[in-house]
Amino acid sequence: MPDWCDTRMTIEGPKDQVENIRKLILQWTSKNYAKNDFGHGWLGNVVLGAGFSYGGENGLSCRGSITEIGEVEEKDPGLYYFQLWYISAWEDVSETWQIILEKFAPSCKMYYCAEELEGDFFITNDKNKRYYEEECIIDSYLEETNPMKMKWNFDEWEYIDRKTLKEKLSQIFGSMTLPKLIEKAKNIPVTNEEWVKIHMIEYV
């Protein structure tokens, strides 16, 4: 059983190509092209519907499924986008999507942010933060009886940028470099039922 990677993806480009690729994805996921365990949202339906193959040396990765497709919206004058969410085994399948876009929406760009907790896999290609501004993920839980609970001002799962992370940790531990602050946070005494994890998102 794989660990599932959650990916948020944005396709951006000219209105006609954005609307067309969204329409095609909806069309490809309206039926099953082959037997699978995921239903119509299976990524393999997108691969096969687009005229590609999966499996083997040259096949496209498609183990997973689309969970949601957003509406087309305007980003800037003449520039449109829609967002899509999918799960895949262990890591994102951005290469599969890139190949499909090159064929059906060559003027479109793809931005994504992928996270797989068990493998400590957190990446994004959105270096300019057009859609995904977070730089860190806080994964924590402290019991009410923990002495640090009152000071720990983070949600159990929180997306945050480095500047805000440093400011909030400095309020708890005092002024020091971000790496030292993160080390302090990770070393908070916890029970077997508690945890403090800070994941830094890697830019690719």
Functional labels for PLM-detected ranges:
Residues 1-204:
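Intrinsic low-complexity, intrinsically disordered or marginally ordered coil/linker segments
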